[in-house]
From Swiss-Prot:
Cited InterPro entries: UDP-ManNAcA_Trfase_WecG, WecG_TagA_CpsF
Purpose of the protein: Catalyzes the synthesis of Und-PP-GlcNAc-ManNAcA (Lipid II), the second lipid-linked intermediate involved in enterobacterial common antigen (ECA) synthesis.
EC number: 2.4.1.180
Gene giving rise to this polypeptide: wecG
Root EC class: transferase
Annotated protein name in UniProt: UDP-N-acetyl-D-mannosaminuronic acid transferase
Length: 246
């Protein structure tokens, strides 16, 4: 019988990744023995692997995060190739965030939301309260000045939040979480990118069948042809994968 409160780790190009079998494993791991883990969650996909390779500051930021997990199907396939016995599946960050919010609502876990446009953040708060009765103890949209950061960190600390989700894009959100943890270490932090936009319907996500087939990247490319340059960068990752340089 599998123990869902522990998880193996796998190394890709020097980066330690948690190997979750599925979403339930991820949730049971993060809420092991009824106690929410503390630290930072970072979703890893092929694009982020490339950024880590090219940017020493980002690499240090992400290496310092306790919970790095495979958000991209390419990363999952690379883990399975390097470790043929690995029972690891993709856990999409947007889905994990929703499941965390549902669990937080059920257990009354205090949540602080950071990032996004003011109207999107307001809609996110309203939907979280209506859908799962989430205990939102504070929020801040992404439009604040650098000199306001410290006061925001103090607000988060004073709120007693046990989950802090940050939608600012990478690496801004990783920098924010690292610095905020110096003031408020006793929480689970999660960088969520554009998740608030998807959750509120401002951005359409790929249909489930595309996600299941591992083609969400292709759906986004067809929806946004301007992403072609970003996708072409991934050829470098494919070279690593197919040459076994993992």
């Amino acid at each position: 019988m599998n123990n869902n409160t522990t998880a193996p780790t796998y190394t890709l190009r020097g980066l330690q990744l948690i190997g979750w079998r599925d979403m339930q494993h991820a949730l049971d791991y993060l809420f092991a023995d009824g106690q929410l883990k503390q630290g930072t969650l970072v979703a890893i996909n092929a694009e982020k692997m490339l950024t880590i390779e090219d940017n020493a500051e980002v690499r240090a930021l992400i290496n310092a995060a306790e919970f790095k997990y495979a958000d991209g199907i390419s990363v999952v396939r690379s883990v399975r190739k390097k470790y043929p016995q690995a029972q690891v599946s993709r856990v999409a960050g947007a889905d994990l965030w929703e499941e965390l919010m549902a669990r937080a609502g059920k257990e009354g876990t205090p949540v602080f939301l950071v990032g996004g446009k003011p109207e999107v953040l307001a809609q996110t708060e309203a939907k979280l309260r209506n859908q799962w009765n989430v205990n939102i103890v504070g929020s801040q949209d992404g439009y604040f000045k650098p000199e306001q950061r410290q006061a925001l960190f103090e607000r988060i600390h004073a709120s007693g939040a046990q989950i802090v989700t940050v939608a600012m894009g990478s690496p801004k959100q990783e920098i924010f979480m690292r610095d905020c943890r110096l003031v408020h270490p006793d929480a689970l932090y999660m960088g969520v990118g554009g998740t608030y936009d998807v959750f509120t319907g401002h951005v359409k996500r790929a249909p489930k069948i595309w996600q299941t087939l591992g083609l969400e990247w292709l759906y986004r490319l067809l929806s946004q042809p301007s992403r072609i340059k970003r996708q072409l960068r991934l050829l470098r990752y494919l070279r690593w994968h197919y040459t076994g340089n993992l």
